[in-house]
Amino acid sequence: MANSEQAYWLAWSQVKGVGPVLLKRLAQHFELLENAWKARPIALGEVEGFGHKMIEKIIGQRNNLNPFQFLEEHQQKNPQFLTPDDPDYPRLLWEIPSPPPVLYYLGRLDHRESQGQIPGVGIVGTRYPTDHGSRWTRKISQALVKSGFTIVSGLAAGIDADAHSSCLRVNGRTIAVLGTGLDLIYPPQNRQLFEQIAAEGLILSEYPVGSKPERGNFPARNRIIAGLSRAVLVMEAPPKSGALITAKYANEFNRDVFSLPNSPDVQEAHGCLNLIHNGAEVILSENQLLASLGAIPLLDQGQEQKILPGDRQIGYLDQTNVPTLTTGARGKQPLTEPPEDLEPTLKKILAAVQEEPTALDQIVAVTALAIGDVSAGLLQLEILGLVSQEPGMRYQRR
């Protein structure tokens, strides 16, 4: 049965311009989103990232939406979902800078898993793996579940499907994170695997029923895979693989990143080899991996924790104690000129990034693009050397 705070989380998730980053700030500032919903404009203005124009838009949308009526209507098609006030909302996921405000699910929730007491490991990779990549994915997945880990992946073809199916084959626990609504199986050939995970594991999505596989959904989905995981394994990935986005998020969220090596002659190995070159741990064997994962500190199991938005979480990912790389003072250095043939969408995103750190949600609001499209675009702009990422999911021009 839904509580009143759940109604306000759901309502705020419908307000355009207020994405996951700003919504978390609201929750931390007001403690209850009911308080934020009823707050006067001057009080909203006290929250970082809420300017005069945005507040005007928020007030207009707020006046046209009844949270409890919307909740009742929404539950007719989406009966099972979590919001961060729920004790089964994943503890690790709340600690990332952009936790999904609504998490729809099929299958069986595990409270100890939600509290981080049963560790999850993300396994990702290309949709077109070699025999080497598939074979090692199956070996590693089964070794992990036999040691008590939960496997987290994205239900895509290739490495994802290998990870899920091999886990289930030995009666292991697996979580699939979708880039669509729970009513749409993508890719269609994974229907049987989808049904098996729904029966024996857990399927999650931040998208409501009816959401199609839009291009921008999948980079956003990847942050959830990284957020749920204590470590992320990239088993095989060519240079532009989406699995590398998951690895990037994992690094930002202070998760360990592991990568499976292969010959430089194999195109599918180039992304993995680049990760290793940049500091990812090498997967050499099942035992070596298990030993490395065993060195990751456990979450405090002595205190069961319901997520309270106003509290600073003390757990595996305490961002206040994580050393971060920051850029030095820019001075009068000229900005990098973008290439003349830069894609229109990337130009639009770049124009929304300021010389001072700009919040992700602000970029989303200015561009009016989906958060997944913006995240993917910012990653490309980083690779081109046009923007840099700062702590707190902020970006600035370079």
Curated annotation (Swiss-Prot):
Q: What is one Gene Ontology biological process annotated in the Swiss-Prot or TrEMBL record?
A: DNA-mediated transformation
InterPro entries reported in the protein's UniProt record: DprA, DprA_WH, RuvA_2-like, WH-like_DNA-bd_sf
- One Pfam entry for this protein is DprA_WH
The record's family statement is: Belongs to the DprA/Smf family.
Function recorded in the entry: May help load RecA onto ssDNA.
UniProt protein name: Protein Smf
Q: Which organism is it from?
A: Synechocystis sp. (strain ATCC 27184 / PCC 6803 / Kazusa)
